[in-house]
Amino acid sequence: MKTTIVLILLTHWVYSQNPTSGNNTATLCLGHHAVANGTLVKTITDDQIEVTNATELVQSISIGKICNNSYRVLDGRNCTLIDAMLGDPHCDVFQYENWDLFIERSSAFSNCYPYDIPDYASLRSIVASSGTLEFTAEGFTWTGVTQNGRSGACKRGSADSFFSRLNWLTKSGNSYPTLNVTMPNNNNFDKLYIWGIHHPSSNNEQTKLYIQESGRVTVSTKRSQQTIIPNIGSRPWVRGQSGRISIYWTIVKPGDILMINSNGNLVAPRGYFKLRTGKSSVMRSDAPIDTCVSECITPNGSIPNDKPFQNVNKVTYGKCPKYIRQNTLKLATGMRNVPEKQIRGIFGAIAGFIENGWEGMVDGWYGFRYQNSEGTGQAGDLKSTQAAIDQINGKLNRVIERTNEKFHQIEKEFSEVEGRIQDLEKYVEDTKIDLWSYNAELLVALENQHTIDLTDAEMNKLFEKTRRQLRENAEDMGGGCFRIYHKCDNACIGSIRNGTYDHYIYRDEALNNRFQIKGVELKSGYKDWILWISFAISCFLICVVLLGFIMWACQKGNIRCNICI
């Protein structure tokens, strides 16, 4: 019985000598922030990797209206820019107007003599970029002809009229002499002259208006010459007319001379438009114009320019994000996300960053969880958190700076004759968009890779910093945790966090506890052996005592044992 008691006491001593079962050790784990539901982003090495935070880089919707602040937006209402320039009677309100962006509506219509412009897109672009319809009348002398031709197709009020910026010349009496007129440009700016030629619907109309069976118009400068012959013939009726007017334009540089020669069918200029160089433009849109502020306008409406990319519309005006084909591109602004597990670590209550992240951290991206004689706790590490944030902050602004530029991208128009040019332009434009789309995806993937790498690096830096502080006073348990072999209260844990921990103070205690643990059982598993040996010896002694009792009882006659063969 004495032996049994000794073995039981030995077993109790084994447990009592375990430093971790009392107040002599502590556990410290390092970890990082995690969220229950992260955001998937793309990196160079992964198509989908989860991060705690990400920012959308693609603006995919407009505000549904065009803002009239930041730019002078002129609503064309029922008028196109060209009709306003020519002086269509119902567009007289736009004479001498200025704009940054002229908005053409789908409801716009012409309400004068039917016309066509062979190079419509170029003229529209030139007038739009000038940003004004400032017009100066000049004293052209037209001798021997009748000026100010009118048409019932072009009403100004109830009276027959014509384009206010053009002078329709017809016969005077029974003659239409050859006209030769010159107009020098003695100014220091370019002048834009608008002129035209009338195509009668029949030979009878031709001779009735111009006497000659076929007229001719030649307009020249030192740099160019255009000769146009009317195409006589019936066309579809428009506003009661089967004839047409073709509109042409000529730019006269400073020091150059405009020369006009004609023997019939001339629609003459009344003066010039002063050309200005600028970033004004024209856009087709049915979005309403409202009082708001935006630096980027699309036909769909204004859009914010706080993102580097947009896929609202290829046509833009102002300081706008680049158009790309992707609907979404997310920039990682947080670390790799590893959602917290329900069962955490070999110590139950805490586990390190290698096993999983920690949800609910509000005071930092990186931090400590600990278990000591005072209980358990958690605290963030502001220094490593700030180091990571400083590197991530500004990423979005840098991407915007690389992609945003003040420019305008107008829609391209080509006549049917220029179909091949149109196809080529569309191919070039599509290629540019494809290239930007690829570059955008690559740029974001590189930035995301850098973000994840640097946040991982900050976690490793914090771990190495802690390991160097603890030295031989603690053991790396793996998984981002340390077992501290001395009593470490909350003040001690705080010194580890703020970098003031002095391992020399605790060195002797830590070494002593470490040797006890190593020598007895914790590290080598001797506890299990001692327990099994103690159990086996106890069972053996119980059997011996029981057998001895039986033999003693037999000798005294208290127990009789009969053996039968």
From Swiss-Prot:
Gene3D superfamilies: 3.90.20.10, 3.90.209.20. Pfam families: Hemagglutinin. A lipid is attached at C554, C561, C564 (S-palmitoyl cysteine). Glycans are attached at N23, N37, N53, N68, N78, N180, N300, N498. InterPro entries: Capsid_hemagglutn (IPR008980), Hemagglutn_HA1_a/b_dom_sf (IPR013828), Hemagglutn_influenz_A (IPR000149), Hemagglutn_influenz_A/B (IPR001364). The chain crosses the membrane at residues 530-550. Residues 1-16 form the signal peptide. Keywords: Clathrin- and caveolin-independent endocytosis of virus by host, Clathrin-mediated endocytosis of virus by host, Disulfide bond, Fusion of virus membrane with host endosomal membrane, Fusion of virus membrane with host membrane, Glycoprotein, Hemagglutinin, Host cell membrane, Host membrane, Host-virus interaction, Lipoprotein, Membrane, Palmitate, Signal, Transmembrane, Transmembrane helix, Viral attachment to host cell, Viral envelope protein, Viral penetration into host cytoplasm, Virion, Virus endocytosis by host, Virus entry into host cell. GO terms for molecular function: host cell surface receptor binding. Belongs to the influenza viruses hemagglutinin family. Major glycoprotein, comprises over 80% of the envelope proteins present in virus particle. The extent of infection into host organism is determined by HA. Influenza viruses bud from the apical surface of polarized epithelial cells (e.g. bronchial epithelial cells) into lumen of lungs and are therefore usually pneumotropic. The reason is that HA is cleaved by tryptase clara which is restricted to lungs. However, HAs of H5 and H7 pantropic avian viruses subtypes can be cleaved by furin and subtilisin-type enzymes, allowing the virus to grow in other organs than lungs. Binds to sialic acid-containing receptors on the cell surface, bringing about the attachment of the virus particle to the cell. This attachment induces virion internalization of about two third of the virus particles through clathrin-dependent endocytosis and about one third through a clathrin- and caveolin-independent pathway. Plays a major role in the determination of host range restriction and virulence. Class I viral fusion protein. Homotrimer of disulfide-linked HA1-HA2. This is Hemagglutinin. It comes from Influenza A virus (strain A/Equine/Kentucky/1/1987 H3N8).
